[in-house]
């Protein structure tokens, strides 16, 4: 019986998502400074634009360099895929805007980064999305705050800046009992210290500016999907499960 090869955290952090260049054998990931890509045929182009096969069509959407980052963080988190963004706040906003719309509701820990609090408390209400803030130490408070229009539960692994510890397994149980996903900001802990998917979270986002980069000279963010939440079965997220008309 053959054994499935698995790699440790250090190996994944160095090599996940990247292969040596097949033409030159170069080990390091290049920075692909391109906006467009070459297609083998009209049929090949059509299959890419119709998302029938993997590949790149335009760097605003995907890029080979960015794809390495996305695959690497997804591997470190134990997720099925990731999307890189221009900042951590962009990652948070992307996750929420994908799942929620006007008339929807979020239950959030109140011990969260100030920028995220402002997004939830001031910006999103302009678009018809309301948030109820609760004590992160009390999973029952999350359950009590859920409304018929609630679409998402949210918290941070460690609250910024007070380092409040969220009981992710208990809050995820609350979310799943109501058919809802749990989104976690894991910026403070990174996959090295905490992997929220193993504790029941469904989505994770990071500000890559902090501990992921480790040097404070870049701005970036990522959203990672665990692959465990049944988006179709929940019946609450048609933007993910139904075609655009």
PLM regions and their residue ranges:
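Conserved PLP-enzyme active-site core in the AAT-like
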Residues: 2-3, 13-15, 19-22, 82-245
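N-terminal "arm"/small-domain region of PLP-dependent enzymes with the aminotransferase-like
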Residues: 2-63, 71-72
